[in-house]
C-alpha cells in the first residue's frame, strides 16, 4: 500500500519541499489498496447531480440530493444492509468509497455550488482537509452538505455526511480508522393531488409550481447513521521475488487482516397533519385505513450491525502452488 512522501530536494544549503498528494481506497473487504489519481481536470464539472454522477440512467425525484435509484440492472446493488438507505447511496457511503491520503504538505479542498432562484434554491458544500503527522501517519476530515427546496411543495432535502479518518502505512503494519456520521432529512409530499394540474395547467390559476396542492405538507423521513470502521494489516515473513533485469524485491509471505465495522442506523417517519386531512365521510384519503392514531404518526426503526472479520491473505508470488 502507499508509503510516505519523498524527502525534500537540496539546492546548495536550501531544502525545497516537494508538494505531493497521494490517495487510495481499500477494496476486496479491505485486503487490497487501489491508488486513485488526484483529478485536476475539469472533465465532468457540469454534472452536479449526485444521481448522474453515480449512474447515467436513473430514476429520481428531481431536486438535487433527493432519493434516486439506478435504472440499469447492472448498477443495482447485489446486497443490502439497511433497506431504507438504498435510495440514498450518495449520503450513506461504503468503506470501498472512502479515500485515504498521504501528502507532504497539508491538503485542503473546498467545493461550493448554488443554483436559484432563492425560493427554490439548491446548495452543495464540500470540505476536505488532510495532513500528515509524519511520513507514514495521516489524519483528516471531510464534510459534505446538500440542501434543496424542490420544485413543488414539501420536497425539501437536507443531507449531511461528516467523516474523520486516519491512516498509518508502515512497511510491516498498516491501520485505517474512520468515524462517519450521516443524515438524510427529507420532506415527502406523496405527489400532487391531481395530475391534471400538470397535464392541463391552463385550466388552473396556480401561477407557480409551488402553489400546486400536494398530498402531504409535513410528512418527513429522517435517517441517521453512525459508523465506526477500523481495518488493520500485519505482514508476515519476507521473500525475494525476481523482477527480471531490475533485480529482486522483498515481498511478504502472507498478510493477516482484521476489520471491525460497527454500523448503527435509525429511521423516523412522521406525519403531523393527519387530523386536518382525515375525513371518514369523504373516503378519498391517501391511506385507505388508519389503525392507530388519526392525529399523527411517528414510526421509528433501529438497525445495528457489528462485523468483526479476520482474513489471511497469501502472496501468490511467494508460493508457486497459489499461482
Model-derived features with residue positions:
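Acidic, small-polar-rich N-terminal luminal/periplasmic segments of exported/outer-membrane proteins
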Residues: 4-104
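Primarily recognizes Gram-negative and organellar outer-membrane beta-barrels
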Residues: 3-9, 94-104, 108-135, 142, ...
